[in-house]
């Protein structure tokens, strides 16, 4: 790993994940910028998480962005929209938001509030979606490399390699 290369890592909420990644990739902790996120996918290309990513990349001159998630990360057992729908007051608000999702494109990139509230079906898919969203963002400098990884037993696997091995299909966007 290049001596002073800054890497922005967007990781899950698991304890010790940052240290495990730094050891596995031979990254000095002082060269790692870390953002923690509950879900593996970026649901809004112009939301708070993306704004934080853009700010950290520019402020710290990060040369790479890594989205790294534990391969066996526990996805939510219960759908958040189911929890919100149990409350009558929140249910009314959900219907209003659903109307906005249906009628206020392109502000909302998802087609429904349920799609916005729910993460991807699996961790690998969420990481791949995030990599694609960051690569396409016009405020991410073109020289910044964007990569996705799954970590299992302290071993990092590039997400594009993971998809080829598991599906035989390479889901990728422009090399960046």
Regions found by a protein language model. Give the residues of each.
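Short beta-strand segments
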Residues: 10-12, 36, 67-70, 147-152
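Ordered, amphipathic secondary-structure segments that act as subunit-interaction surfaces
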Residues: 58-78
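Short secondary-structure capping micro-motifs at structural edges
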Residues: 50-57
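Divalent-metal-activated hydrolytic enzyme cores
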Residues: 1-5, 14, 40-45, 60, ...
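Generic hydrophobic, helix-prone segments enriched in Leu/Val/Ile
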Residues: 21, 71, 97-101
């Amino acid at each position: 790993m290049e001596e002073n290369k800054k890497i922005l890592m967007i990781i899950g909420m698991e304890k010790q994940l940052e240290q495990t990644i730094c050891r596995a990739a031979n990254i000095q902790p002082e060269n790692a910028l870390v953002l923690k996120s509950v879900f593996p996918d970026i649901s809004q290309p112009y939301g708070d998480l993306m704004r934080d990513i853009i700010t950290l990349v520019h402020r710290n001159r990060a040369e790479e962005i890594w989205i790294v998630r534990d391969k066996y990360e526990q996805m939510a057992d219960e759908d958040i929209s189911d929890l919100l729908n149990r409350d009558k007051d929140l249910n009314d608000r959900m219907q209003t938001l659903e109307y906005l999702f249906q009628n206020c494109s392109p502000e909302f990139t998802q087609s429904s509030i349920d799609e916005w509230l729910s993460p991807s079906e699996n961790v690998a898919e969420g990481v791949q979606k995030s990599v694609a969203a960051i690569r396409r963002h016009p405020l991410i400098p073109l020289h910044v490399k964007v990569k996705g990884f799954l970590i299992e037993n302290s071993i990092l696997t590039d997400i594009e390699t993971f998809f080829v091995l598991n599906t035989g299909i390479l889901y990728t966007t422009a090399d960046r």
